[in-house]
């Protein structure tokens, strides 16, 4: 049976995705101290749904967006590399490519034009992941 670790399972996307996945799904709370020590050895998949998208109170800083959307991605990816899991899935955002209305269709080859700290931090995470080398047996 597939064992999936779902990061951000309490958020909007993660909470909706969790019930749709097959196999055993474990929500991982990275706000818990030493959360890395609780990663099961037999996990097959890491799914990252962690993200800071909104600033409802008007108090979020650039650092807040980059920490949640970029720095934590690097931490999760390093944990993935150390684990026995084979698959890392990162959920990004259209904002990493475009945040304004565009007449042409967006494709994988579209040049990114993020405007906000949210979009820029999501784009930075995508670029980081695309530059990483994967050992044999991981994707």
Briefly describe each language-model feature range:
Residues 67, 102-139:
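Catalytic helix-loop patch of NAD(P)-dependent Rossmann-fold dehydrogenases
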Residues 2-23:
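N-terminal Rossmann NAD(P)H-binding glycine-rich loop of SDR-like oxidoreductase domains
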Residues 75-117:
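Conserved Rossmann-fold NAD(P)-dependent oxidoreductase catalytic core, especially the SDR/UDP-sugar
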Residues 16-20, 79, 128:
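Rossmann-fold NAD(P)-dependent oxidoreductase module
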Residues 22-39, 51:
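Adenosine-cofactor binding site in Rossmann-like domains, unifying the SAM/SAH pocket
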Residues 36-82, 96-100:
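NAD(P)H-binding glycine-rich loop region in Rossmannoid oxidoreductase-like domains
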Residues 7, 46-50, 88-94:
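SDR active-site strand-loop-helix element
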């Amino acid at each position: 049976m597939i064992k999936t670790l779902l990061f951000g399972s309490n958020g909007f996307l993660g909470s909706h995705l969790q019930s749709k996945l097959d196999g055993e799904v474990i929500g991982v709370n990275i706000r818990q101290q030493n959360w890395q020590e609780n990663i099961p050895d037999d996990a097959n998949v890491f799914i990252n749904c962690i993200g800071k998208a909104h600033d409802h109170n008007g108090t979020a800083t650039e650092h807040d967006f980059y920490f949640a959307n970029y720095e934590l991605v690097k931490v999760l990816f390093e944990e993935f590399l150390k684990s026995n899991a084979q698959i890392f899935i990162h959920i990004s955002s259209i904002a990493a490519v475009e945040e304004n209305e565009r007449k042409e269709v967006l494709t994988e080859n579209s040049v990114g034009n993020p405007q906000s700290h949210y979009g820029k931090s999501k784009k930075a995470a995508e670029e980081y992941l695309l530059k990483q080398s994967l050992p044999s047996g991981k994707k």
